[in-house]
């Protein structure tokens, strides 16, 4: 196998791992006692409702293996909503929430099981005890190979 084939194989593996990680999301989290609050303003909520007004919004961080781990989730019903994003509990050895400066990865799963990646404006990083207001969002469906 030559270098180009090896690089193509490695690239394909990482792309497929990223896509499968986005499709295998678990929207459950533990309350760690410390958080950041994020409010989705009505303008952002309207964009989500244009896709589906029933589902779950989740905030995820990536672990060292590149897996997405939920640190907050909320049932969404088509209106303005806010979520507390859990911080890492420094009294435990495992990473169980966001650390300062972590990029926030947003996903939305509608009631039919379709998964969407959410790009927020402004784009945020985690900052303990802060409040962020998301003014607008763009959703792009993640191809999970699910047919409805």
For the regions a protein language model found, what residue spans apply to each?
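Bacterial N-terminal signal peptides that target proteins for export
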Residues: 1-7
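Primarily marks secretory-pathway-exposed extracellular/lumenal segments that are disulfide-
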Residues: 7-10, 16-148
């Amino acid at each position: 196998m030559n270098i180009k084939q090896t690089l193509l194989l490695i690239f394909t593996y990482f792309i497929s791992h990223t896509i499968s990680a986005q499709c295998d999301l678990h929207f459950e989290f533990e309350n760690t006692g410390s958080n950041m609050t994020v409010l989705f303003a009505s303008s952002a909520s309207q964009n989500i409702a244009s896709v589906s007004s029933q589902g779950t919004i989740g905030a995820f961080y990536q672990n060292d293996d590149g897996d997405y781990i939920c640190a907050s989730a909320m049932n969404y019903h088509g209106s303005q909503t806010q979520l507390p994003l859990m911080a890492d509990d420094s009294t435990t050895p495992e990473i169980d929430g966001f650390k300062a400066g972590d990029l926030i990865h947003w996903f939305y799963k509608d009631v039919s099981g379709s998964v969407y990646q959410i790009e927020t404006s402004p784009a945020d990083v985690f900052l303990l005890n802060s409040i962020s207001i998301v003014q607008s969002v763009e959703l792009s469906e993640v191809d999970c190979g699910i047919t409805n």
